[in-house]
Amino acid sequence: MLAVGRMEDEEGPEYGKPDFVLLDQLTMEDFMKNLELRFEKGRIYTYIGEVLVSVNPYQELPLYGPEAIAKYQGRELYERPPHLYAVANAAYKAMKRRSRDTCIVISGESGAGKTEASKHIMQYIAAVTNPSQRAEVERVKNVLLKSTCVLEAFGNARTNRNHNSSRFGKYMDINFDFKGDPVGGHIHSYLLEKSRVLKQHVGERNFHAFYQLLRGSEDQELQGLHLERNPAVYNFTRQGAGLNMGVHNALDSDEKSHQGVMEAMRIIGFSPDEVESIHRILAAILHLGNIEFVETEENGPQKGGLEVADEALVGYVAKLTATPRDLVLRTLLARTVASGGREVIEKSHTVAEASYARDACAKAMYQRLFEWVVNKINSIMEPRNRDPRCDGKDTVIGVLDIYGFEVFPVNSFEQFCINYCNEKLQQLFIQLILKQEQEEYEREGIAWQTIEYFNNATIVELVEQPHRGILAVLDEACSTAGPITDRIFLQTLDTHHRHHPHYSSRQLCPTDKTMEFGRDFQIKHYAGDVTYSVEGFIDKNRDSLFQDFKRLLYNSVDPTLRAMWPDGQQDITEVTKRPLTAGTLFKNSMVALVENLASKEPFYVRCIKPNEDKVAGRLDEAHCRHQVEYLGLLENVRVRRAGFASRQPYPRFLLRYKMTCEYTWPNHLLGSDRDAVSALLEQHGLQGDVAFGHSKLFIRSPRTLVTLEQSRARLIPIIVLLLQKAWRGTLARWHCRRLRAIYTIMRWFRRHKVRAHLIELQRRFQAARQPPLYGRDLVWPTPPAVLQPFQDTCRVLFSRWRARQLVKNIPPSDMIQIKAKVAAMGALQGLRQDWGCQRAWARDYLSSDTDNPTASHLFAEQLKALREKDGFGSVLFSSHVRKVNRFRKSRDRALLLTDRYLYKLEPGRQYRVMRAVPLEAVTGLSVTSGRDQLVVLHAQGYDDLVVCLHRSQPPLDNRIGELVGMLAAHCQGEGRTLEVRVSDCIPLSQRGARRLISVEPRPEQPEPDFQSSRSTFTLLWPSH
């Protein structure tokens, strides 16, 4: 049994050798003993240098998770026991250190654990990146991790060799920014085994997605899809109805997996409508598989009459694909053909033809669905808003998880392509690890003992050779008009490859009874002999589907389904180019994949399947030995023991490590780069672990590189500070010079603008001294910002100068009136219609014989007495008024305003003083906006005085402005503000009571008078 233990930092000798390179004797027996010992001790990982050998334990081991990731993060390969995390970390560090694309190639036969290995690699990369928790990077990481779950549902199935076998090839590129955080990705898929949709071997299942839909969906959803929960009801899922996804984990039920896939699709970014469309397409495929065709009795087989046994299924398919039912039925029973004259002919199917078309449609629908899912994930993972000029060049880590070598009881076209793919990858491994390495040693003049290995190039050539290769012969058979059968194709292969050492058939080897005449051929692959049945080769290679189905599904109302069939928009009469065959497309994709991998720095994970029964803790020595042999692991160990861990051109080596040696920093003065490298290594004491080639340095041990990297890492912060200091100083000097230039330009430009502005001012104000306007209508030019305060001051000075020019000829006796009018204009602010500006102001109207002919002498006597008593200096204003008191009674009174007091006088009693209010107590007055003479005087500590100026000559003369102006001018002279309010409804206060007063014009009113109500006063004003 497999010993399950926790991963320790170091491994003792009881666990065997952690690296096969360290074996004392390099034989197959020693290799297998070490592999078996480590497997029994729970050590499923072993190195061959930097290549990781992984044995599938078929059980969960406590080797993974955040704690294990922390132990491997930032470490070198030899510092921790062998692990997938170590390989992922090495690929990630190589990418960051050298800014070079890397790839991790995971290979091995079906069931060896490749898919699980790729998951752990993705988990490690996601865990060690994005320490700053950038939202966009987190989004990309979530999509990368969750995409595996979705692709497994649609691309994996249970086989007899593997409970979760990838039935497609997957290569994922992960894009990283200059900080090493993932910013995007792209998934390439290869050769989905779509024939599995129709039929599976005994003990196998269809793709997981079908069973997850049936067993994991809610009853209401299944009812809407016209589905039953039992997979045995449907032809396409009946074979695997009694099987589960896997046996290792009880949680791996279809129901729980369906929930996980739905959550993953939500996180990735599939909309609810898109998920619903996916379920409808899966349901339509299941219903399509249950459609049976029968010949109609009335027509008979000779007339080709055909009908569907259960037309309800046609309705289900039509509803789920959002297409017309009649069109679905017609497409299933017949096909349309365009003749040479562009005439469209409808040709009815036979039962066999209709069944073939139905199956082709089901396979194509699932393939298009799978491709759409992959493209959807790619569109979401695509790097967004990446500009190499700003963000730097992106680097890439590629992860290849592709189907392993397969040998089934009956091997068809799919197994042929899968095994060809594995031959190509093995050829790449041979080229990079064995062949190119030995050739480089010879080219560089390094002493080397040649190691023999099997080169599978001849097998690859057998498959892909132009004109004569198996794929070329198959394409020729597909393109030839006439009754070309699989048997004729086999005969052609026998003719072309009769003498090929890796090809055989029953015709060429009649004694080999493992093959049937006219059906089988055999290829001696690097992994073993595989017999292929040619039945279905031509049909699967053509991969044909009637155009009627493409047009039908393209015209679907469902936008998701419609997007999967862009080729359906072609008209039936349109002549199209023959599409490339499935084999050619796969070959081209493999060539492109190998070229892509060859352009990157590779890291290898070689997966081994311990036994055929998928039993935990059991290692079948013979089965594992066979895998070790065909994977070339022993040869890999030999090359590694005799070879070097790293090689670098001298200039590149110096560029990276020259700062660690005083003779090479910053630039060496030695004869050549090779001499400089030698001096650098001698200073570190590492010259014994290297070999000098013609143009490259070869380093034997990874520890040498680690030593140099550690020295470099210690010096980098010092160099960075030095560079930062120099660069910041340069930037500061550049900035200072730029500022000086800016200020010089600003200074001269400012002078220019000031000079131009002053010249313009001088030009405009040349005629400002000419009377009578003195420049009143001149427009001031807009000044530069720097001159705005200066111009504001100039405008004030100009206004004062102009005012001086206007008033200097006015007699001194009129200046009091002028100042009062100016004060009135400012106080009223244009809110009153007429305020007597155009007439002369007499001010003291009670002393005037014109206004007060009968009592002017009496007022003069009273005025003299008041002047002697109160000591005021001048009379500001006097007039007869009509006043209203708090008792709502109106009386004739006189108003006298002096420079010290405001007097209310009684004209009927020789102008006796009724009230005297100190002028400093007067805080404001209120007037209306009309021509009436109402005024309310407000004084602090006194009732408001409500009066109407009247008994003037001429009658109703407008004297409100005169009162306002004289009082406002006097207050200005004393340095205080008089509040003047203009309102048609004036509030007032008398003995604490609040009232309102307004004006009502009346034509019949002979003289102004007051009318009162409970809380209001109204001035009745003659309007004639």
From Swiss-Prot:
GO terms for biological process: cell gliding; cell-substrate adhesion; establishment of localization in cell; exocytosis; Fc-gamma receptor signaling pathway involved in phagocytosis; phagocytosis; T cell meandering migration; T cell mediated immunity. Changing K883A: Abolishes localization to phagocytic cups. It is a peripheral membrane protein. ATP binds at G108, E109, S110, G111, A112, G113, K114, T115. The keyword ATP-binding applies. Residues 15-713 form the Myosin motor domain. Residues 716-745 form the IQ domain. Pfam families: Myosin_head, Myosin_TH1. Specifically expressed in hematopoietic cells. Detected in adult tissues of the immune system such as thymus, lymph nodes and spleen, but not in brain, lung, heart, liver, small intestine, testis and kidney (at protein level). Highly expressed in T-lymphocytes; constitutes the most highly expressed class I myosin in naive CD4 and CD8 T-cells. Also present in B-lymphocytes. The keyword Cell membrane applies. Transmembrane segments: none annotated. Belongs to the TRAFAC class myosin-kinesin ATPase superfamily. Myosin family. The myosin tail domain mediates binding to phosphatidylinositol-3,4-bisphosphate (PtdIns(3,4)P2), phosphatidylinositol-4,5-bisphosphate (PtdIns(4,5)P2) and phosphatidylinositol-3,4,5-trisphosphate (PtdIns(3,4,5)P3) and binds to membranous compartments. It is required for recruitment to Fc-gamma receptor (Fc-gamma-R) phagocytic cups. Interacts with calmodulin; via its IQ motifs. Unconventional myosin required during immune response for detection of rare antigen-presenting cells by regulating T-cell migration. Unconventional myosins are actin-based motor molecules with ATPase activity and serve in intracellular movements. Acts as a regulator of T-cell migration by generating membrane tension, enforcing cell-intrinsic meandering search, thereby enhancing detection of rare antigens during lymph-node surveillance, enabling pathogen eradication. Also required in B-cells, where it regulates different membrane/cytoskeleton-dependent processes. This is Unconventional myosin-Ig. The gene is Myo1g.
